[in-house]
């Protein structure tokens, strides 16, 4: 009988290297928020990938960066704590970018862990094959990685091969989650993240990190209809105007795009109501951050 592998794998890397894209690719559902703006992942989003011979729980950590506020402190704490809780580490980098100080900072952290560390060079669809080997050799000069695998999370290139390699390093173990469970976050959290993703796609650079979303109410009204009420929090009145848009057009578009994805997630029709409120300097208010679900209760 074939042995069954199971384990927890942390995905770590600088902001915007494609960690969320990878999680969504291997899970087959949108679990982690995707945006072209850095530092958009705020919690350890666990995506559960179940195959006949293995179950891998991916922990998509917030991108490593120097904290600028209480929320940033929390994001960094989550990223570092994750390294001590898992069976393998994916260090993801952009194959089409130079090694930066952020990468060097992470490598120094990784040198001190006993867990297997896989270097995953993402976005190989954006580089010429001749440029790949020199990049790999450059990373090898920093530390000895357990394995080095180039992939494109967006295009799906080499992703299955990486999963096969990863499985060989995981311990034998049971399924921790049922076959049909794809995340350990409650549905309300994922719904809030979908709404936040749409706002990030539709607003300008000044908005992203000032956005928080709380799902106030989520009720199944019938077999095929769910009623959701959510509040979008910003830090300034001017940001509220940007999110709402002229004549409410921007907010309507956010709702339209979010509703489409939420209906796919829940498998039923969704009636979505959105409000925008100003909560000044909310990213520095620990109690408020906890209230909207971005901080786990910790001792």
UniProtKB/Swiss-Prot annotation:
Keywords: Cell membrane, Cytoplasm, GTP-binding, Membrane, Nucleotide-binding, Ribosome biogenesis, RNA-binding, rRNA-binding. GTP binds at residues 13-20, 60-64, 122-125. Residues 151-153 are annotated as: G5. It comes from the Bacteria. Residues 39-43 are annotated as: G2. One of its GO terms (cellular component) is plasma membrane. Residues 13-20 are annotated as: G1. Its main location: cytoplasm. It is found in: Cytoplasm; Cell membrane. Monomer. An essential GTPase that binds both GDP and GTP, with rapid nucleotide exchange. Plays a role in 16S rRNA processing and 30S ribosomal subunit biogenesis and possibly also in cell cycle regulation and energy metabolism. This is GTPase Era. It comes from Staphylococcus aureus (strain NCTC 8325 / PS 47).
